[in-house]
Amino acid sequence: MPESICVLRLSAIGDCCHTLPVVRTLQSAFPKSPITWVIGTTEHKLLEGSDGIEFITFDKSDGFSSWKNLRRQFAGKQFSVLLNMNASMRANMVSTAIPALRRIGFDRARARDFQWAFSNERIAERHPDRRHVLDGLFQFAEYLGVTDRQMRWDITLSDADRQLALDVTSGPGPTCVISPCSSQRARNFRNWSIDKYLELIDYLQNQYGAQVLLTGAPTDIEKHYAQEILARTGNTVTSLIGKTTLKELLAVIDAAKLVICPDSGPAHMATAVATPVIGLYATSNPERTGPYNDQQLVANRYPEAIEQEFGKSVSEVRFGQRVRSPEAMDLISVADVTAKVDAVLG
């Protein structure tokens, strides 16, 4: 049994949601071993207060200064085990500020950005090769001899978080949360079109009398989506875009009957609170990054996008291969999504 465990997973929201049940599993297996988690400041805002976990935040925007702060916080301390569950050069640098006897990283094939050079032990190679990100993270627990998974998240929410959610979901009809946009990165085309969202909203309202809530961050693209959708639906939709904290958003998702979103954090937040989620996937493989417990609800046009982009089948390309085409998400039809809606609300 390790005397102490440090988990290093800085980001992003979805991946930290994947990491949490692994940490819960380690807590169950090693109840006397304190667990520290080095996490990004944004992600900490969602997971803050999770029982039995000491969080140490790292501000990615503050770079070297944050690294020095970590060094100071860990001065005189040594962990039995460091689980570096974040294969990136930034995480590699952060790991050098964490004193640990055993420094466990990914196997060579998954140890991106030379992570293998910052580890002295590695988890087993992935077999079968095509596994969900969450399954890959559970290999860290398995490496420590723990195979009994605890698929629980138990993210702490306040009474105020719950009350806000109750206030915005108490209208007639089922509450459907639409988080229309993913985080914006270069050549990362994951967003469905506004026109298709409008058709979907019309179906939700007319077929099920649904109360539709838009959620998201206050980015320019998300605010644009909200403005267009509100204007073209006659304000029959409520926009919470840029108006909630992450914990408030989780409470809203928990209170909703359904979440619809592209490959993004809210898909995995919904998984954490067992709210059905329809994932919109064409540019990334849902077998790897889809909502873990709702694969059957994914509107999946990834195979068609791969064929269109590479002239190959999914099995012929690298697992996790991205499609960098701005047209790929248009392969998902409104009918693809309404069929999944009917499976949940019908």
Segments the model singles out, each with a brief description of its role:
Residues 1-346:
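Catalytic machinery of carbohydrate-active enzymes
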